[in-house]
């Protein structure tokens, strides 16, 4: 891989035009880069701020070829991209992140094996392809357990929590979508995540460990710093660095973990891109995850990631985006981000708010109650 420096003024091509691409593009443009984007939706969030918008599917080879022609460097905002298209790009354009890590993280089986090969712990699991294999796996792992499709699925899609044997038949419907993975249910104390970024030159940095709270399998809140001992925070960061080095990472990697009741950290999922749980970095850290992404892939020195002040990020799902209209006082000590999606849907990530003050139990509960009264719901 060439370790060239891509200087401001160059064109950065982004595959994917959602909110992650938009915030990436804004950071790139602030640094003096131009941006081109490919997305199936015209006037996508990223398309609204890009210099060039190509409206086409991600695996449209002609669109990918056009993006390569006009861009000095290519990156992406999410992992479920056509591998063949990315592999073609690797040979015909400058794709510093490569395609191999995406291939690993597109499949939960290969992802689990890669995590274990790096020397990190995961919850006990079994790969299942048939109903008989599912039955056998349940006998070995015991219930409750979570059945997930190996490919696809996000924000709670493509998974089923099996609490009792009577639900086996219902869960088995997931097998129609292909190979699945059955994971033991982890009784965890807390969910944590660390965003680690590694540059083309091997320079590495981590952002502060975030505490994540999910509702309906969708991220609801990220609290920083996580309300755990500093030793646990450091252990989480060390795990992320270990994975980044073992996987030969270029760019950002979100490492989601369970903190068990006995203080162990189990790696749950990886995402080789900017991550929802890292949105707090836009306002609470010296450098955001999006700017760090641009620095890393362009070969620039990484920025400092110190936490400037504690706070909490809360997602705006569906019509929760209207909460600000109903109570403008929410923004008194907060920053608002609206992504620019044209249609409000139940469970759709429409924006987020970052509260810039010390997260205390009482006001965290106040915010939680306000959101729960509206309940943006699970993604459709």
Swiss-Prot record:
InterPro entries: ATP-grasp (IPR011761), ATP-grasp_carboxylate-amine (IPR003135), ATP_grasp_subdomain_1 (IPR013815), PreATP-grasp_dom_sf (IPR016185), PurK (IPR005875), PurK_C (IPR040686), PurT/PurK_preATP-grasp (IPR054350), Rudment_hybrid_motif (IPR011054). Gene3D superfamilies: 3.40.50.20, ATP-grasp fold, A domain, ATP-grasp fold, B domain. GO terms for biological process: 'de novo' IMP biosynthetic process. It catalyses: 5-amino-1-(5-phospho-beta-D-ribosyl)imidazole + hydrogencarbonate + ATP = 5-carboxyamino-1-(5-phospho-D-ribosyl)imidazole + ADP + phosphate + 2 H(+). Its EC number is 6.3.4.18. GO terms for molecular function: 5-(carboxyamino)imidazole ribonucleotide synthase activity; ATP binding; metal ion binding; phosphoribosylaminoimidazole carboxylase activity. One of its GO terms (cellular component) is cytosol. Residues 112-298 form the ATP-grasp domain. Pathway: Purine metabolism; IMP biosynthesis via de novo pathway; 5-amino-1-(5-phospho-D-ribosyl)imidazole-4-carboxylate from 5-amino-1-(5-phospho-D-ribosyl)imidazole (N5-CAIR route): step 1/2. PROSITE patterns: ATP_GRASP. Keywords: ATP-binding, Ligase, Nucleotide-binding, Purine biosynthesis. Catalyzes the ATP-dependent conversion of 5-aminoimidazole ribonucleotide (AIR) and HCO(3)(-) to N5-carboxyaminoimidazole ribonucleotide (N5-CAIR). Belongs to the PurK/PurT family. Homodimer. This is N5-carboxyaminoimidazole ribonucleotide synthase. It comes from Bacillus subtilis (strain 168).
